Amino acid sequence: MSTVSDYFGCLVFDDRVMKANLSADVYASLRRTIDEGAKLDASVANAVAAAMKDWAVAHGATHYTHWFQPLTGITAEKHDSFISPAPDGGVIMDFSGKELIKGEPDASSFPSGGLRATFEARGYTAWDPTSYAFIKGKTLCIPTAFCSYGGEALDKKTPLLRSMEALNRQAMRILKLFGNTDVKCVRTNVGPEQEYFLVDKEMYEQRKDLIFTGRTLFGAKSPKGQEMDDHYFGVIKPRVAASMEDLNEELWKLGILAKTEHNEVAPAQHELAPIYTTTNIATDHNQLTMEIMQKVAAKHGLVCLLHEKPFAGVNGSGKHNNWSMATDTGVNLLSPGETPYENAQFLLFLCAVIKAVDDYQDLLRLSVATAGNDHRLGANEAPPAVVSIFLGDELMGILDAIENDAPYSGTKKTTMKLGVDVLPRFPRDTTDRNRTSPFAFTGNKFEFRMLGSSNSIACANIMLNAAVAESLKIYADRLEGAEDFETALHDMIKKTIKDHKRIIFNGNGYDATWIKEATEVRGLCNYPTTPDCMPHLLDKKNVDMLTAHKIYSVSEIQARCDIMLENYCKAVIIEANTMVDMARKQILPAVEGYAAELAASVAAKKAVAPNLACAYETGLVTKLSGLTDQIAEKTDELESAVLELKNAESVKEESFAIRDTILGKMAALRAVADEAETQTSSDYWPFPTYGELLFGVK
């Protein structure tokens, strides 16, 4: 029987495989490209391509694809076979360095936000050698970036790699000031915890809303939900456990470090957490994880729902983005050190994050903005839409002492002067796990909790990396010219604490009084919906910062703003149209059918005994008749409102109309339809109920 260590990464062209299949010179050259970004020689590319092809064919692969992440939010691939014609009429298996490095898929059907004209169909994919190639089915998948004919990024990987390089550049400047001469690079690492729901496939296929939108648009509350807290960390049901076992095996074969699995708070909700890895690799792995979750679930007669809010009345699903910075020598820059200098270095990087989050709250908020995630944020199950940082009382006490040049209770020293007095060592576990905080320090990393479950983690990490890079640049510019480094360092950390402590909040983020304090007293941003926050991507300070660090060009920023608003509008319009369709073709006929049966029952009874009151039946018929009138009326109103959207002069105007009008009409239609469900016989109700969906998997 094979063990996990026997087959882990068996479908990945990783470092072990490269060492075994490449010559020493080729391997060393490729490692320099991966580790230092050195240019890849054509002869090396050819050797790597040949070895990659031979390895893939030996594992049953017949095709290869440049696997990329366009602005749709999911992955894309076009499969080409390895075969080339041979002179004797047969075929040979061939794969060149040119085919490895560059591809030319048709870009015309991917979102571009105006970055290319309709007739400019050509796009390019370029190999990302830092993310290992892997085999999926019979296809060798080569992780790539995707750009237009003119060179503009049309994907999520390209700006992510740019943001990682921007942070690396600025962090290296800081580390040199602290005398870290052995460090060659700084990488950001991420471990994204993935939440999801599993429902029975047969039930799923009876619900148009789940099929078309990924969430239920109608559904009365189940008699039981998550009130008993008996699902969280509870015993995993056999079908779910079997699916999880298969999922782990598939992920491990692809070198994905799936570590922890458990039941989440809501019925039918679960979580998978991996071990952290370099950000661009973690992004690739998370995209793969979501894809494989859905495929494996289907094999077990289940459907994996990744929507942020598939069911009203119970928790939705998020994705916690555990983010840290580390040197190539293995030093976590968000871990307190042993010496005064190490502690000062830690505090400087900590303050860089605090400053970044405060200065660019809007970018962090819009980086997680989608129609689905708008249902979660601020709903007493997820962090609020207001961005704040949780540090814990002990770390906050240290920062207060530094700001005020005051004694800190955790040390015998009289003042907290950096570089002179040793800051107290505090274990990682002294920071509580504040689940209500959007951005929490958890000992040696920050946990960004606002991401939606179906989101790519790329955008959130792009904005976070870029914002921190900007803070570090400001610090490096000041410190590099300082006459007295220690004094300048102390003063700068002190100033950061004073200027940006408004973003720090250690209390209950669900409390309504916090939102009032945050916005009215502290002046923090509160953008409840995607249309509220997305236009701020174009604010001058944001455009200036993102272009200065070469994360995006101005045109790329404008394109992404338009695309995100378009995606929002399209998602909600599909939901609205689905509601109209379900109301007219399923709900109204079902309620009318039940009312007709009741009316027939009354007529039959009165034919036998004319003096019978039949109060129950007549009362219910009257109520159902009133509800059907309301459902029909509100369905017509919703349909008309959707048609009115065509008059919007811009995607921004359309998104505002959806926020202000469409969502309210959808909620009004749902309210009366859900009321009708509670009054209609289950024999007549046309699709599975919440109780059946949430508790139907055994």
Can you say where each PLM-predicted feature lies in the sequence?
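Active-site core of metal-dependent hydrolases
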Residues: Y7-E120
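Active-site-proximal loop/turn and secondary-structure-junction residues that shape catalytic pockets
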Residues: V44-V48, F68-P70, K98-E99, F146, ...
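Short, intrinsically disordered, low-complexity segments enriched in Ser/Thr and Pro
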Residues: S84-T118, D229, A352-V353, A476-D484, ...
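Hydrophobic/aromatic-rich, well-ordered segments within soluble, folded domains that form packed cores
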Residues: A61, T65-Q69, H285-K299, M325, ...
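Flexible inter-domain linker/hinge segments
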Residues: M1, S5-R16, E165, R169, ...
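Glycine-rich, acidic/polar active-site loops that bind/position phosphate-bearing ligands
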Residues: E120-L306, N315-G318, M325-D562
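C-terminal amphipathic alpha-helical interaction region
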Residues: I493, K498-K698
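Short linear, low-complexity motifs centered on an aromatic residue
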Residues: G73-G89, S108, R207, G214-T216, ...
